[in-house]
């Protein structure tokens, strides 16, 4: 079974959604046969690569809110994150461009498949939300990526050029083709789409449904009671 997850490094609900799908997988009987692949999505492709303002200020300006109103919204998200064991510092996060972070997530998949890609994704989310670091800054990105397991030389090569940019854009185009208007967005076996950071129970239901459909059980229409057969204890005579 394959789960594709579209998310952005600066999306607070994406980190929450990550924890919830992980919780669902922890209770899923066939979790060891599930592949999780991270896809790129940018909430604001035009955001600056050199940030100049806090996310809270940008949101207040964008939605016409007062600073107090923006703070209340952030407090609510932080409370939900805490329920999932996450520590957010939203009042300190910066409004920034995530294309380079996404390019390193693609590098993670190239170097170590879904497992290493997931480690890079987790490290970047933690750096942004828990540590309030500037994940558009190349020095920060290099430090986080190398600590997560990426090869330093390749990290430098990617950050110095445009490698994987087309992959990032292709992921975004695919999400739009699926009808996704926001993130997180989950697609299970290219068949079921789940929008938003749904409760773990919702993910569990979809996982069970998708698994049962891809691994159907044979319906037995006639049993041994109506016809002779052999079993562990011998054959009917």
Language model features: what each stretch is:
Residues 1-6, 37-39:
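Short, well-ordered beta-strand elements
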Residues 3-30, 105-106, 110-237:
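C-terminal cap of thioredoxin/glutaredoxin-like
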């Amino acid at each position: 079974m394959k789960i594709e997850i579209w998310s952005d490094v600066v999306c607070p609900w994406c980190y929450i959604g990550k924890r919830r799908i992980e919780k669902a997988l922890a209770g899923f009987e066939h979790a060891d046969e599930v592949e999780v692949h991270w896809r790129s999505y940018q909430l604001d492709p035009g955001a600056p690569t050199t940030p100049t303002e806090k996310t809270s200020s940008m949101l207040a300006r964008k939605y016409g809110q007062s600073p107090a109103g923006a703070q209340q919204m952030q407090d609510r998200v932080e409370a939900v994150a805490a329920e999932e064991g996450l520590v957010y510092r939203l009042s300190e996060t910066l409004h920034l461009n995530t294309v380079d972070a996404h390019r390193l997530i693609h590098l993670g998949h190239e170097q170590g498949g879904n497992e290493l890609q997931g480690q890079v994704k987790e490290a970047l989310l933690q750096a942004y939300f828990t540590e309030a670091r500037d994940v558009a800054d190349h020095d920060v990105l290099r430090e986080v990526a190398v600590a997560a397991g990426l090869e330093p030389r390749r990290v430098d090569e990617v950050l110095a050029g445009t490698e994987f940019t087309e992959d990032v854009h292709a992921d975004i185009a695919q999400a739009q083709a699926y009808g996704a208007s926001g993130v997180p967005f989950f697609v299970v076996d290219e068949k079921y789409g789940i929008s938003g950071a749904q409760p773990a129970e919702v993910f569990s239901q979809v996982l069970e449904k998708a698994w049962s459909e891809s691994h159907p059980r044979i319906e037995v229409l006639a049993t041994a009671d109506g016809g002779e057969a052999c079993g562990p204890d011998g054959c009917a005579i």
